[in-house]
Structure formats: C-alpha cells, structure tokens
Amino acid sequence: MKLSKNNRHTRNHHSALSNGATVLFLLAFGVNYHGFAANAMMANPRPFTETQPDGQLIRLRLNGDPYDAWTSDADGYTVVRDPITGFFVYAEEDGNGGLQPSHDLVVPLDDNGSRRLASESKNRKKHLRPSKRDCSQMICGDNERRSKLPLLGRNLRGYRSNDHGLNDTDDDLKTFNIFNITRPQFQDSSDDDNGNGRRLRTTGTLRNLVVLLKWEDHADRPVPSPQDIDVLMNHDGPHPLAPTGSVRTVFLENSYDSLQLESTITDWVVVNNTEHYFANGNGGRSSVIWEAIEYALHYLDDNDLVDFDYFDEDQDGQIDCITFLHSGYGAEFGGTDQYGAFWEDRLWSHKWALYVDPFVSKSGVQVMEYHISPSLWGRSNSKIGRIGVIAHETGHFLGVPDLYDIDGGGIGVGCFDLMANSWGFDGRQYYPPQMSAWTKLLLGWVVPYFPSPGENQIAAFQLRDASL
C-alpha cells in the first residue's frame, strides 16, 4: 500500500497549554549560527559503567556531540580504548595532532586512592582532543565545520508579513537589535545553494514522512511496530508508550497550537549493510550513513510504497519534512549496548544533508536534508524511543541551531531550551524543556511586546497569548 493522502494518519489534537497560562522570558544571550545543516543531539549527561577485560569496573562519561565527541573519566580526563589490549586507558597526544593510548589504565571504581594519585601525578590535560582531523566527509567540531564542510543548511528563517504578521518596521527590527540577534535572511528555493535555502512551514499542518530503518544484522531483533511508532509521533495525550505525550504534542505546545506535525509511518525497511558498517567506527559521523538513507528511499520509491508528492504539499520540488528512525540504540547514550557494540559502533542522532547526491523520487521530489534517531531507548531491552531526541532533531529540521555547549566548558542555555537539553531535567527524555522565547521568536510562534517610552503601568501578572 502506498503511503499517501488516502491512508495518512489524521487526528484532532489539542495543545496541553491551550487552556493554561504561559509566561515567557526572553533571555538576552548571543547565539552564533553558521548556517550549516549538520546539527545533532548532545551526549547523555549521565555517566556509565564499563568493565575492563580483567573484570575491573570503571566509571566513564560521554562528552560533546557528533561534531566533537570524546570519552572521559569522572574527572574529565580523556579516555580511549587500546585497540590491541581492549583496555580503557588515558589518552595522550601522538605528536601529529591526534591521540593515542597511553600505558595508564583508567582508575577503577574500587581504587583505594593509590592509582588515582599516580594518575594525577602525570599532569594530564582535561578534555584532551585531537587538534587535526579530516572533516571533508565527516561531521566535525564547530571551527572545522565552519571552514571545511560545504555550506549545507538553510539560514534561520526570515520573517515575512504574510507568514508571521511581522513587517520590516522599526519595532520588528528593534526585536532583533535589542537582544543582539542577527536577523535571518529569507532564501527562496530557487537560490543556487544546493536547494537548502527553502523555508519550512512553521504554522498549519506539516506533513512528515517517518522512515523506519532496520540494519541488515538486526533482521531478527525486536523493534517497535509501525503502529507503536505512530503513537510516539502522533498520539493525542498521554499513552503508555508516550506517557507525557507525543512528538506532535511537543510542537503543538511550543507553537501554541500553530504547528500540527502530521507524521505518516512506513514499514521497516531492511537496509543492505550492518550497523557496524554504517556507524563506521565513529558513531555514524561520516557520509557512509548516506548510503542507508539513499537505499531506504529508493526502496520505498521503486516499490511504490510512498507517494512522495503528498509530502511536498507546497510543490517546491522538495519533501516538506522527513524523519528516520533506526533499529539500534543511540550512540549518544555512550557505553556498550547489550549486544556488545560500544557507542562508536552505533549511530549518533543527528540532522544532516545528502549534499553530494540528493535523492530524487520518480515523480521529481527531492530529499536533501534529513534527521535520524533511534527507535529504541537506552542501551538494552526493546523499549520504544522517547520524544526528547526526535523533537530536538525535528527542531533542527525547522531551522533552529543547537544551543548547548560543545567544548566541555559549559552547558549552553541548559534547561531553558529544547535545543540545549533535550534529555530533560531527569535525563529520561519524557520531559524535554520548552523552546525558549528566543527560539519561538525565530520560528514565528511569539510576538514581541514593547513597552512605550517613559513610565509604564503593568499588572503584577499578565497573560498575553504567544507574546514575550
């Protein structure tokens, strides 16, 4: 059966905030956004336990994101696995801009203090990382992305009066100038920028195709059914599979009922290689993952399983919104999963683009940008994935950048924005934060309110729908 308007999922959804009071505070923080399409989920903030080959238990932590990920001990010293011995050891510089294993084992959990003292006497640097990497076909750190990756992404969306009720008035410009926001420039899809300049719908109904990818070596693994994924993506209100609401609910709440994300779920597509292959030893941070994306899209198109025209409602020749969910555990959880795969041999959730060879359906609909997340939660069992990561990556698809720290020196805006802490206050991804007023302003979901010059009389508490 071809997925199209004749069998799409339709529901009457109501925002959990539609009858409640919401007060927004606009934080005056500066955000650097370089227009690249590569964005991703931050690492699991919780530490994890690994077992050394000799049975010793050690406590490690995954840091960063796909651009720049590294493993450290509880004190922040970089750890690598020795490929010869299999032991986790402290990293050291190799003299050529890279890292190599030292001979010092990571301090175990049951250490009496002697090993720790011996380790600290080495005067190691915390958060040690390679200074040189080949980023020509890989998601890398911020500076390397800026200088070496092609310009993939659309700029943050500019405002137009017919879309958001904002004109190029003094007040509108003041909104951006007061808070040191660089106003985004609108780019039409006709611009010569590999098709990435187009603007996504942020009001009304946004049709989202959800493609389920099963790695070749996962053919017999238990995974959520398409019907279960439909609950995760579309359900109205709490459900045992999505106890705090669905991904659709997240965007209804954040947009004050302005954006209705309508997701249509495919059956599982078994791709033509293994999880280990597509992860490529670096958490799927290289262009090898594009092979899986392309394979699944061609399979769906060649077998007439998806009406791609239906997902190009604005008829600009590009799919309106697309989500990929895979059959493995997310690399961003760190550690080793129940099947023995370390995080580097799993896929890290991210949003990127097929900028070398975009997919084009038989009817002429192009898929350039995509985002991908795990369908499973954690590192073991077959529990369905959660809304935090999918909502975060969908936010990127709408054009919002990451707002978390990427160099280990801080936490960015932290719990004040979905794009900074999609794990939520308890790390379970059931309670991802609301988007900040800054983000909602960029997406056209709030309208700035300016007090008049001079003295203003204001109520101690005032409700203003979709206002700052």
Locate the predicted segments by residue.
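Extracellular hydrolytic enzyme modules, especially secreted metalloproteases
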Residues: 321-323, 327-468
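Sec-dependent N-terminal signal peptides
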Residues: 14-26
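Residue-level micro-sites within transmembrane alpha helices that shape
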Residues: 18, 31, 391-395
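A broad, structural surface signal
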Residues: 1, 294, 298, 388-396
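N-terminal secretory signal peptides that target proteins for export/translocation
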Residues: 1-16
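C-terminal segment of classical bacterial N-terminal signal peptides
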Residues: 29-37
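Zymogen propeptides/activation segments of proteases
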Residues: 3, 36-363, 468
